[in-house]
Amino acid sequence: MGRKRSASSSRWLAEHFKDQFVQKAHKQKLRSRAYFKLDEIQQTDRLFKPGMTVVDLGAAPGGWSQYAVTQIGSKGRIIACDILDMNPIVGVDFLQGDFREESVLNALLERVGDDMVDVVMSDMAPNFSGMPSVDIPRAMYLVELALDMCRQVLAPKGSFVVKVFQGEGFDDYLRDIRAMFTTVKVRKPEASRDRSREVYIVATGYKG
């Protein structure tokens, strides 16, 4: 006898396919609904300009990179990384690997090269177990690594956008970002599901 989906997973699938942003992404042949989250952030915060260099962490399936390419143009460059594979996007240099591993970080830094990065963006998230006591520390570890990446490659006055799940450690993390950047906003894009604990911290004016 085949296994049945749980009530919660069936409910998630029903919500997913009813979601207007999922439908829009499908109609427009976009990689994911995350495209619209970054678009909304760009309309408000103006992170991207033509010719910029961008690092995209947790890039797969490619919604953020796909959007950023439209903003930075052919003279810009995106260096993207994810533990999962991602179909190629013109203008995106993709590295598959676990960003938590030193060897992957070094390979990513090698691809960045001597260029200073204008925007670091992170949509990284762990595989969730459903246990907040486990999931939140895992998620916070990833966003701390993303902030460390800023310290290594971000140009003065550069920008950082990161998905963060509200919970233990969030306030301390926000305080750290405010110490490093001139302007820091917490955004909840319309394309983010209401019941999700995710928010996006948008930080501009890196103090270097």
Curated annotation (Swiss-Prot):
Membrane-crossing segments per the record: none
Primary localisation category: cytoplasm
Binding site for S-adenosyl-L-methionine: 62, 64, 82, 98, 123
Enzyme class: transferase
UniProt keywords, alphabetically: Cytoplasm, Methyltransferase, rRNA processing, S-adenosyl-L-methionine, Transferase
EC code: 2.1.1.166
Superkingdom in the source lineage: Bacteria
UniProt-listed InterPro entries: RNA_methyltr_RlmE, RNA_MeTrfase_FtsJ_dom, rRNA-MeTfrase_E, rRNA_MeTrfase_gammaproteobac, SAM-dependent_MTases_sf
The keyword rRNA processing is annotated on this UniProt entry: yes
Job description of the protein: Specifically methylates the uridine in position 2552 of 23S rRNA at the 2'-O position of the ribose in the fully assembled 50S ribosomal subunit.
The name this protein goes by in its record: Ribosomal RNA large subunit methyltransferase E
Organism: Actinobacillus pleuropneumoniae serotype 5b (strain L20)
Lineage: Bacteria, Pseudomonadati, Pseudomonadota, Gammaproteobacteria, Pasteurellales
